Amino acid sequence: MELKTCNILGLDILVTDMEKTVNLIEQNIEQLRGKYICVGNVHTTVMAHDDPQYHTVQADAAFVLPDGGPLSGYSRKHGFPEAERVTGPDLMLALFARDNGLKHYFYGSSEETLALLKEKLAEKYPHLQIAGMVSPPFRELSEAEDKEMVDQINASGADIIWVGLGAPKQEKWMYAHKNHVNGVMIGVGAVSYTHLT
């Protein structure tokens, strides 16, 4: 995968738009397995600048998308006129709309939100393959519980795991599960699911 990026506060942010991003994920789904994608905004970019540990987490992603308007705006002002904002909820909808046979797994949010999301997605995207949905406990999982959760995700055959735990928790979770989860993990934020219901 050849990626064009713009360095913002020491973090490489992907120069892209929605169509390019969807194509990038679809065409490289096998290469992306076991990896993760961060959906960055000003808050997470500044946090990565100020916290070396969180910077490592962000920098280790397959790529960081410009969810925040100021990030794509900065890229445009610094030699990348094609840079556009790619938000988590919009990326989800764009991928759901494609009849590409990919299986989606949803990790995070409440049982109620997930049930409503499942209902809405079935109505709007009847072709969409939902491999599973889970609302993990708010507390940290034990090692055994975590292994069980990973086994459950992998057994589902999910291609894309949407991680909605909120920043920085979701990025740290994806970093810890790199090469353990078989699909590509995309951190979209806890509110992304509610945007879709």
Question: Could you say what each language-model-derived stretch is?
Answer:
Residues D50-D51, K77-H78, K118-E119, W173-A176:
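Short amphipathic alpha-helical segments
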Residues T194-T197:
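Conserved small/polar residues in nucleotide/adenosyl-binding loops
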Residues S72-Q152, S156:
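Conserved beta-alpha
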Residues E145-N182:
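A contiguous pocket-lining binding segment that forms or flanks enzyme active sites
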Residues M1-R85, P89-D90:
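N-terminal nucleotide/polyanion-binding subdomain common to many enzyme families
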